[in-house]
Amino acid sequence: MNILSLVQTALELGLICSLTVLALFLSYSMLNVCDLSTDGCFTLGAAVGATVAIAGHPYLAILAAMAAGVLSGFITALLQTKMGIDSLLAGIIVNTGLYSINIAVMGGSSLLNMNKTETVFTKARALLQGTVLTEQYKLLVAVIAVAAVVVFLTLFLRTRLGLAIRATGDNPDMVRSSSINPAFTTIVGLCVANAFTGLSGCLLAQSQKSVSIDIGTGMVTIALASLLMGQVLLGKGSIFKRAMGMVVGAFAFRLVYTIALRLDMPAFMLKLVSSVIVVLAIATPYFKKQLPMLRRRMAARKEARRYAED
């Protein structure tokens, strides 16, 4: 097993998927909305991006995928804020509807092949030809995309609108009393978050040079696991630190996932691996809190035994 190759593969996929984790960070951690349309939106971004790239516009494909994500987020937010539908149910409804839309975008097929299609990655490889970064062209594109999103998110959440979005997640009643419409901030937050998800799907499709209808299946679980791992690894702090925690968490998750693949683990077991990682990530903070209490109990028992022996 080539360790460097394994780490590079995990880093490339981790960075691309970290865009979805950052989307979940905005919607779930900041806005306090459980958006279950992530799977469908990811596939939508991949399908739209692949279709536009096949038409000969790889750069335009990125913008189109993000626009499709914005539209998906807008519909999800509209169901919640204007129709009184619970956020969980709204996400499920949109995710279900997106399956048919994604098939339609892909021309009625469940698989798109992009082997002969020029992508942002092939353009980057041609640009870096003959340099020391020739073999790292995918990694470079992923780093640029993630850096741009992290910087944007850090600056955006410091603006008045960004602060209003954060306040909406913390206390919507206070936001409402401050003459800020929480419905508006929810719509904007979900539109931005889903734009990141669409971008993530588009980049993964162009990286793999293929799109299947189930490319986004389980993505919300993967993103949640990565988010929780990032919180455990880097903890709380500034927006930039927390955003970087999402990137680190995505890489850590993909590293474990890639190792499982290299160990010839059956494909049907990988979903179980994802579930176990989620459980461990959620339970770790709890066990950290319980550890001092456990130590005190053990110390008390030792003290009691010492007195009993005396």
Where are the predicted features?
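Loop-to-transmembrane alpha-helix initiation sites
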Residues: 13, 87-89, 116, 138-143, ...
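Transmembrane helix-bundle core of multi-pass membrane transporters
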Residues: 87, 91, 98-158, 187-188, ...
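Cytosolic-side transmembrane-helix boundaries in multi-pass membrane proteins
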Residues: 170-177, 181-184, 256-310
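Alpha-helical transmembrane segments within multi-pass membrane transporters and channels
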Residues: 24, 57-96, 249, 253
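Short loop segments and helix-boundary regions at transmembrane helix junctions
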Residues: 29-34, 74-128, 209-213, 225-244
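Transmembrane alpha-helical segments in multi-pass inner-membrane proteins
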Residues: 196-271
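Helix-loop-helix "hairpin" substructures at the membrane interface of multi-pass membrane proteins
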Residues: 72, 135-215, 220
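Membrane-interfacial amphipathic/re-entrant helices at transmembrane-helix boundaries
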Residues: 1-20, 48, 54-60, 131-136, ...
